[in-house]
């Protein structure tokens, strides 16, 4: 009898550990009067992918919900999702977009294009994950100079932090307040996504990554359309009525 009790206890422990392995590090963080949803991804255990179009039909996913349903149809549960970088009026990436090692849209080094909005607030940058599983946030110029092919990458802007310093174009008391999302690679395998639960300016959002989250290089992803999704918690960020189609979605699915 004791033998069977021990076996059941061990089995329960294994099941419990398996369940915990699927749980993401998600928390609500308060910073200077505003709340943020912050998700840490350990790339040693969580496979972060980037998705724009259905690989079968070529139709753009457009929304996190569409991607979630696609995952279900393939017996994969969506654990985490976030919009990728800035895109143009045709809902195509405005800058570099790399998916599964293929460069779909090349690096954009154009300067001073007013139609590009925040993307033209320089320097802009790239968030990339390389074939060795390591992630990095670099300015667009630094990414080009590296010349390394990424497994996945999105280009957006502006850079929030460059080598531990705030983007010099940010103004402390700016009245440009919006929902904002961003990403940093705190270490090569510790990726942090954050979205504000209310409108904030760039200066405050950059300081969140520097002073609260401990990042040295961080990239702004997008503004008032930005949301994060975490399985079991739902959506955080901009109100649903403000969300528009995305041209690229970061996602972590359950393992088959």
Predicted regions mapped to residue ranges:
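Bacterial N-terminal signal peptides
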Residues: 5-16
């Amino acid at each position: 009898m004791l033998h069977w009790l021990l076996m059941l206890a061990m089995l329960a422990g294994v099941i419990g550990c398996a369940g915990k392995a699927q749980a993401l590090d998600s928390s609500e963080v308060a910073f200077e009067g505003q709340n943020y949803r912050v998700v840490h991804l350990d790339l040693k255990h969580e496979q972060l992918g980037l998705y724009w179009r259905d690989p079968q039909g070529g139709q753009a996913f457009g929304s996190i919900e569409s991607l979630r349903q696609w995952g279900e149809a393939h017996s994969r549960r969506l654990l985490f999702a976030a919009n990728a970088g800035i895109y143009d009026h045709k809902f195509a990436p405005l800058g570099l977009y790399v998916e599964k090692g293929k460069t779909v849209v090349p690096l954009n080094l154009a300067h001073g294009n007013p139609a590009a909005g925040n993307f033209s607030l320089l320097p802009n940058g790239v968030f990339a994950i390389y074939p060795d599983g390591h992630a990095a946030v670099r300015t667009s110029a630094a990414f080009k100079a590296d010349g390394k092919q990424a497994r996945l990458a999105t280009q957006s802007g502006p850079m929030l932090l460059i080598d531990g310093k705030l983007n010099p174009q940010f103004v402390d008391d700016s009245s440009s307040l919006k929902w904002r999302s961003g990403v940093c690679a705190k270490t090569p395998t510790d990726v942090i996504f954050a979205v504000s639960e209310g409108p904030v300016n760039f200066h405050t959002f950059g300081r969140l990554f520097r002073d609260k989250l401990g990042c040295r290089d961080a990239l702004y992803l997008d503004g008032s359309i930005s949301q994060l999704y975490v399985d079991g918690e739902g959506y955080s960020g901009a109100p649903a009525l403000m969300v528009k189609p995305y041209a690229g979605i970061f996602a972590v699915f359950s393992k088959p």
